[in-house]
């Protein structure tokens, strides 16, 4: 798990004019602003001609006219991570980092992600999809308590509630329903919280060292993700070699099952029997000072700047039109 990733060092000048797309209009805008600024500074330090572009304040027409040769997507959540932007970039013929429209859309939808994983025989907690007509009082009878309620299309723990008792179901549902028409109710897996960064595409996709996250009181919420210095991270995680290998292998299989490309992150819970359970996929992970992908890269000797350059060097359009008859 600790072997270095060996790849040729990209020529910064050959990358051309790079746009760092950040900000946006999702509930994760503030995180994206931090990610984008970090990526921008890292690319500049590596000699890349990089420019910030806030998709929440500027138009698609302005993006098309900006003269970028490629873009680094440092957006999180809706409109930036859900396939919407990726489809627009395909139409513009502008190479971009990360997954294509389909994989981005699937991965952003936690319900569809779990359905794909189950179809591939990959372990993920039991779940139900709730709407306004759902009989909330009966859900714990099937999924057990505690359970998790979350909006299917948000990240960074936005709108998530850990429901401890029947009386908490209504409030937890209302919190998640602020963000989505449907709510994902998920079996709670007690254990250790793990995450695995994956770099590459297809057969070349490979896992970086497993990270364990230990938040105060087990509460890895928005504050503890991005601002708290109390959260502890262990990279590589202190796991038996066989368990670490299983988690890394499952991360790559989960990533490939969704058709992810370029880079991403897969989140897990590890139960008391050392069985990993897939939680969700992130196709545009955070790149802040507290973020996990840079931490995993550092563990194999890859600096933050090297990581950013490596990711943007693989920017590409993912939808290929069939050849036209002349």
UniProtKB/Swiss-Prot annotation:
Q: What is its main location?
A: cytoplasm
Binding positions (Mg(2+) 1): 267, 280
The record's Pfam families line, in alphabetical order, gives: Dala_Dala_lig_C, Dala_Dala_lig_N
- State the free-text cofactor note: Binds 2 magnesium or manganese ions per subunit.
GO CC annotation: what is one? Answer: cytosol
Q: Where does Mg(2+) 2 bind?
A: 280, 282
Record's signal peptide: none
| Annotated compartments | Cytoplasm
- GO molecular-function term, one example from the UniProt record: ATP binding
HAMAP family on file: Dala_Dala_lig (MF_00047)
Similarity remark: Belongs to the D-alanine--D-alanine ligase family.
Name of protein = D-alanine--D-alanine ligase
């Amino acid at each position: 798990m600790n072997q270095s990733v060996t790849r040729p060092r990209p020529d910064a000048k050959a990358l051309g004019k790079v746009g760092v797309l950040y900000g946006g209009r999702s509930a994760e805008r503030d995180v994206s602003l931090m990610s984008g600024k970090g990526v921008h500074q890292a690319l500049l330090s590596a000699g890349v001609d990089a420019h910030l572009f806030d998709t929440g304040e500027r138009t698609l027409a302005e993006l098309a006219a900006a003269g970028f040769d490629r873009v680094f997507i440092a957006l999180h959540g809706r409109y930036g991570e859900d396939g919407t932007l990726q489809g627009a970039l395909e139409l513009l013929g502008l190479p971009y980092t990360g997954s294509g429209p389909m994989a981005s859309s699937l991965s952003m939808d936690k319900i569809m992600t779990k359905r794909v994983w189950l179809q591939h025989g990959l372990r993920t907690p039991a779940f139900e999809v709730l709407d306004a007509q759902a009989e909330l009082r009966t859900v714990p009878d099937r999924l057990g308590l505690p359970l998790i309620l979350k909006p299917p299309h948000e990240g960074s723990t936005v709108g998530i509630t850990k429901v401890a008792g029947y009386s908490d179901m209504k409030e937890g549902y209302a919190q998640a329903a602020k963000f989505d028409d449907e709510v994902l109710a998920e079996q709670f897996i007690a254990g250790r919280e793990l995450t695995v960064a994956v770099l590459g595409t297809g057969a070349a996709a490979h896992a970086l060292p497993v990270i364990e996250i230990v938040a105060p009181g087990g509460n890895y919420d928005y504050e503890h993700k991005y601002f708290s210095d109390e959260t502890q991270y262990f990279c590589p995680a202190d796991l038996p070699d066989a368990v670490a290998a299983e988690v890394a292998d499952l991360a790559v299989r989960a990533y490939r099952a969704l058709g992810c490309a370029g880079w991403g992150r897969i989140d897990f819970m590890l139960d008391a029997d050392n069985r990993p359970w897939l939680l969700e996929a992130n196709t545009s992970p955070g790149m802040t000072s507290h973020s996990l992908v840079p931490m995993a890269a550092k563990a194999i000797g890859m600096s933050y700047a090297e990581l950013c350059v490596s990711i943007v060097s693989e920017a590409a359009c993912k939808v290929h039109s069939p050849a036209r008859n002349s």
